[in-house]
Design a protein with these regions (language model features):
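Conserved "right-hand" nucleotidyltransferase catalytic core of DNA-directed polymerases
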Residues: 4, 10-11, 21, 34, ...
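Conserved beta-strand -> loop -> alpha-helix junction used to position metal-binding or nucleic-acid-contacting
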Residues: 15-31, 39-41
């Protein structure tokens, strides 16, 4: 995963030039329909080898420690295996690509040149205006409250717009709307598709859909982005997964 390594080294002022190969991208170009191109999966698939998992050296969940806290002997064995397996995967995968000129061309002229470009984009990050986001979040919250009040007025009483159970009761029991879709357990569905299907039969489903769209904007963007700004750079740093099918 050259992109990851380039970013780690860049954090220490080391700029890598002349990148030639990436075993993850070799696997991706060779078999783009495969679901996994990570080192552990590729080692098992092409080398028949079970790698040391990160959780085995650092733990998992709440008890997981940072790699800097792993004892030196264990860290060295893990890192050495990582380097060794990466080379062995390249030796296994490169002959395959090299034997198919069209695939080699894609790899050498598109995928590999793209690696440092994406790495640079990740390092640069995206400048975020926190003040604008906060204002937008407040505006969204105000509009959501208005939609909530409208929904309560239409239903004739207050209810939780975020509760599928309460929505089922209001829409299908109290208002008597005909459910077009069911959940796996046979209950009337209140997901987006189900509400769209009945939105022309009553105004409440459309109010709920509008409320949900604003709630998603607020939770995913205006509230979330401010919380993931890197305090050192003042930017949001994205991650681009090159070895995947769009």
């Amino acid at each position: 995963h050259a992109n990851y390594d380039l970013n780690i080294l860049a954090n220490y002022g080391i700029v890598v030039q002349g990148l030639k190969h990436d075993s993850m991208l070799e696997s991706y170009v060779w078999n783009a329909t495969a679901t996994r191109h990570d080192m552990d999966s590729l080692a098992n698939k092409y080398l028949g080898y079970e790698t040391i998992k990160y959780e085995q050296v650092a733990g998992k969940g709440a008890r997981q420690i940072s790699f800097s806290q792993v004892d030196l002997d264990t860290a060295c064995r893990y890192a050495a295996e990582d380097a060794d397996i990466t080379l062995r995967l390249h030796l296994a995968l490169w002959p395959k690509l090299d034997s198919v000129p069209a695939l080699r061309k894609v790899y050498e002229e598109i995928e590999i040149p793209l690696v440092p470009v994406l790495a640079a984009m990740e390092q640069r990050g995206v400048l975020i205006d926190g003040d604008v986001l906060r204002r937008q979040s407040q505006q969204l919250g105000k509009r959501m409250l208005e939609l909530q009040q409208q929904a309560h007025a239409v239903a004739g009483h207050e209810f939780n717009l975020d509760s599928p159970k309460q929505l089922q009761a209001v829409l299908f029991d109290e208002l008597g709307l005909q459910a077009k879709l069911k959940t796996p357990t046979g209950q009337p569905s209140t997901n987006e598709e189900a509400l769209e299907a009945i939105a022309d039969t009553h105004e409440l489903p459309r109010l709920i859909l509008d409320y949900r769209s604003l709630a998603k904007l607020r939770s995913t963007y205006t509230d979330k982005l401010s919380s993931i700004v890197n305090p050192r750079t003042g930017r949001v740093h994205t991650s681009y997964h090159q070895g995947s099918v769009a």
